[in-house]
Amino acid sequence: MIGKLKGTIDEIGEDFVVLDVHGVGYVAYCSARTLAKLGSAGEAAVLFIETYVREDQLRLFGFLSALEREWFRLLQTVQGVGSKVALALLTTLTPGELANAIALQDKTSVARAPGVGPKVAVRIVTELKNKAPAFAGEMSASIGLKQELGEGVAAAPVSDAVSALTNLGYSRDQAANAVAAALKNGGEGGDSAKLIRLGLKELAR
């Protein structure tokens, strides 16, 4: 099994990169987000690799971090999510954004990924709710927000508030942290408009 490759970029295609490692060219399929962050041909690159072996083929998938690779594996535990859809999800959402979407049960954000219909989006946020790995840093905002939600806070206004703040240009982690702080400072039980207003105050500090 191949776990990691370090070499020189030989070619970048629409959904793959060819990495030259000591004269051997390895084709690794990547998310568009990963491909965009790689350098140009001739530059050095390191990829974390997930190796798929089938009866008729061997395919490599490349990631810039071990965290992204773990999410690739985790997403495919959901029925209806294969490697293509998993890469589409990782193109549309960062691992941190995925964590927040799952914590908030935000199926709308998940459904933005190509190939992810409403039913699959519901399965992803439902089935991974208790399975998503609690990686340090990437999961902090979602875990904090989940703790602030508790049992008595409606998820819909919270999700709407986070979405509204991201539409204003804030990152999903910033928005989630702001809404979590808003809940803590008197926003619990309020509607999305109140949470947005309090969230903006938190972001302005």
Curated annotation (Swiss-Prot):
One GO term of the biological process aspect: DNA recombination
Listed under GO cellular component are: cytoplasm; Holliday junction helicase complex; Holliday junction resolvase complex
Tell me which SUPFAM superfamilies the record gives: DNA helicase RuvA subunit, C-terminal domain (SSF46929), Nucleic acid-binding proteins (SSF50249), RuvA domain 2-like (SSF47781)
Task: Indicate whether DNA damage appears among the record's keywords.
Answer: yes
Question: Gene3D superfamilies, from UniProt?
Answer: 5' to 3' exonuclease, C-terminal subdomain (1.10.150.20), DNA helicase RuvA subunit, C-terminal domain (1.10.8.10), Nucleic acid-binding proteins (2.40.50.140)
Q: Which GO terms describe its molecular function?
A: ATP binding; four-way junction DNA binding; four-way junction helicase activity
* Segments for region (Domain I): 1-64
Q: Where is this region: Domain III?
A: 153-205
- Broad class of the protein's primary localization: cytoplasm
> Which intervals of the chain are annotated as region Flexible linker?
144-153
One Pfam annotation, family name? RuvA_N
Question: Which UniProt keywords are given for this protein, alphabetically ordered?
Answer: Cytoplasm, DNA damage, DNA recombination, DNA repair, DNA-binding
Q: Where in the cell is it found?
A: Cytoplasm
Q: Where is this region: Domain II?
A: 65-143
Please give the subunit comment from the record.
Homotetramer. Forms an RuvA(8)-RuvB(12)-Holliday junction (HJ) complex. HJ DNA is sandwiched between 2 RuvA tetramers; dsDNA enters through RuvA and exits via RuvB. An RuvB hexamer assembles on each DNA strand where it exits the tetramer. Each RuvB hexamer is contacted by two RuvA subunits (via domain III) on 2 adjacent RuvB subunits; this complex drives branch migration. In the full resolvosome a probable DNA-RuvA(4)-RuvB(12)-RuvC(2) complex forms which resolves the HJ.
Entry comment, domain topic: Has three domains with a flexible linker between the domains II and III and assumes an 'L' shape. Domain III is highly mobile and contacts RuvB.
According to its UniProt record, which protein family does this protein belong to? Belongs to the RuvA family.
What job does the chain carry out? The RuvA-RuvB-RuvC complex processes Holliday junction (HJ) DNA during genetic recombination and DNA repair, while the RuvA-RuvB complex plays an important role in the rescue of blocked DNA replication forks via replication fork reversal (RFR). RuvA specifically binds to HJ cruciform DNA, conferring on it an open structure. The RuvB hexamer acts as an ATP-dependent pump, pulling dsDNA into and through the RuvAB complex. HJ branch migration allows RuvC to scan DNA until it finds its consensus sequence, where it cleaves and resolves the cruciform DNA.
Instruction: Report what the protein is called.
Output: Holliday junction branch migration complex subunit RuvA
Q: Which organism is it from?
A: Sinorhizobium fredii (strain NBRC 101917 / NGR234)
Gene designation per UniProt: ruvA
